[in-house]
UniProtKB/Swiss-Prot annotation:
Swiss-Prot/TrEMBL domain comment: The homeodomain differs form the typical one by having namely 4 instead of 3 extra amino acids inserted in the loop between helix 1 and helix 2.
GO molecular function term, any single one: DNA binding
Protein name as catalogued: Zinc-finger homeodomain protein 9
Annotated positions for site Required for DNA-binding: M244
Bias type Pro residues, positions: 136-155
DNA-binding region(s), chain positions: 192-255
A Pfam family the protein falls into: ZF-HD_dimer
Zn-finger segments (ZF-HD dimerization-type): 52-103
Lineage: Eukaryota, Viridiplantae, Streptophyta, Embryophyta, Tracheophyta
Function summary: Putative transcription factor.
Coiled-coil features, chain-numbered ranges: none
Length: 312
C-alpha cells in the first residue's frame, strides 16, 4: 500500500544572505595648531649619521682678529665619555665638540610636498612640525672678506705672537718692525687716530746725545751711523728724523750759555755775554756816544747809565 506524503508546496521566502556590513572608517582627527590645519604624520625616526668636521673656534677674538687652528675633523679624545658632555674634546686641537662644524648625512630625506599624491583632505595649508627635531643646518665656512670690509683682516700666528709679546727692548730691529706692523693691523682701518710711538727714558737720552753729536740734522755722510744707531736702540730712521725735528728747538737752545755776541772795543756801545749767561754792557771807555758802565760819559758828552754826565 503506497503512502502518499503531502508535500508542502508553499513557496518559501528566500533566506537573507548574511552580509558583513561595510564599516565606515572614521576620518583621521584633524588638530589645529596656531590656527593652521595640520595632519598627523607617522614619524619615522631616521638613523642619520652625524659627523663633526673642521674646527671653527676663533682664537683671536680677544684682540678683534680671526684665527683658526686648522683642525680639519673632530677626533674624540680617549678620555671623553658620551655621558659627560663636558669631556667631549678633540684630541687634535683640544677644543670642545661644539666648536666643530656639524654635518648630518640625511640619505632618507622626505620628498618635497609637490611630489606627494594629492588628496582631498590636504587642500588646506599644511604645517609640518616634524622638522623641528632635525638638527640645525651646518654652519657655512667663513667667507673671504672684501678689501672694503670694516673688520680687520686675519692676523697670522707670527704677527699675533709678536704683538702679544710686549715691548721687548732686546729684540732685533726686524722683529720690532714686525711688532709695529702687527699693531697697525690690529687698529681699525676706518679710525682717524694716528699711531704714536712711545719712547723710554733710555731711548730719549740716547737720541738726545746722538742728535747733539751730529748737529740735530741727518746728513748724507751720516747714513751708516744713523742706521747703526737706529738698530741699536730699536727705532726706525723716519721716527728718529721726526723726533729730531720736533725736539731740536727745545733741546738745542736749552743749554748753559746764552747767545754769544762779539765784544766791541772801539768805543761804540754794544752787548756782551759774560761767562754765567747774563747779558751785560761793556766798553773800554775810549770812545764816544756810547753807553758805559762808569759814571762818566765819553769824550763827546754821551749819556750814561746812572744819568750823570761830566765833561773832560
Amino acid at each position: 500500500m503506497l503512502e502518499v506524503r503531502s508535500m508542502d508546496m508553499t513557496p518559501k521566502s528566500p533566506e537573507p544572505e548574511s552580509e558583513t556590513p561595510t564599516r565606515i572608517q572614521p576620518a583621521k582627527p584633524i588638530s589645529f595648531s596656531n590656527g593652521i590645519i595640520k595632519r598627523h604624520h607617522h614619524h619615522h625616526h631616521n638613523n642619520n649619521k652625524v659627523t663633526y668636521k673642521e674646527c671653527l673656534k676663533n682664537h683671536a677674538a680677544a684682540i678683534g682678529g680671526h684665527a683658526l687652528d686648522g683642525c680639519g675633523e673632530f677626533m674624540p679624545s680617549p678620555s671623553s665619555t658620551p655621558s659627560d658632555p663636558t669631556s667631549l674634546k678633540c684630541a687634535a686641537c683640544g677644543c670642545h665638540r661644539n666648536f666643530h662644524r656639524r654635518e648630518t648625512d640625511d640619505s632618507s630625506a622626505v620628498p618635497p610636498p609637490s611630489l606627494l599624491p594629492s588628496s582631498t583632505t590636504t587642500a588646506a595649508i599644511e604645517y609640518q612640525p616634524h622638522h623641528r627635531h632635525h638638527p640645525p643646518p651646518p654652519l657655512a665656512p667663513p667667507l673671504p672678506r672684501s678689501p672694503n670690509s670694516s673688520s680687520p683682516p686675519p692676523i697670522s700666528s707670527s704677527y699675533m705672537l709678536l704683538a702679544l709679546s710686549g715691548n721687548n727692548k732686546t729684540a732685533p730691529f726686524s722683529d720690532l718692525n714686525f711688532a709695529a706692523a702687527a699693531n697697525h693691523l690690529s687698529a681699525t682701518p676706518g679710525s682717524r687716530k694716528r699711531f704714536r710711538t712711545k719712547f723710554s727714558s733710555n731711548q730719549k737720552e740716547k737720541m738726545h746725545e746722538f742728535a747733539d753729536r751730529i748737529g740735530w740734522k741727518i746728513q748724507k755722510r751720516d747714513e751708516d751711523e744713523v742706521r747703526d744707531f737706529c738698530r741699536e736702540i730699536g727705532v726706525d730712521k723716519g721716527v728718529l728724523k721726526v723726533w729730531m725735528h720736533n725736539n731740536k728747538n727745545s733741546f738745542k737752545f736749552s743749554g748753559g750759555g746764552a747767545t754769544t755776541v762779539q765784544r766791541n772795543d772801539n768805543g761804540i756801545g754794544g752787548e756782551n755775554s759774560n761767562d754765567d749767561g747774563v747779558r751785560g754792557l761793556a766798553n773800554d771807555g775810549d770812545g764816544g756816544g756810547g753807553r758805559f758802565e762808569s759814571d762818566s760819559g765819553g769824550a763827546d758828552g754821551g749819556g750814561n747809565v746812572n744819568a750823570s754826565s761830566s765833561s773832560s
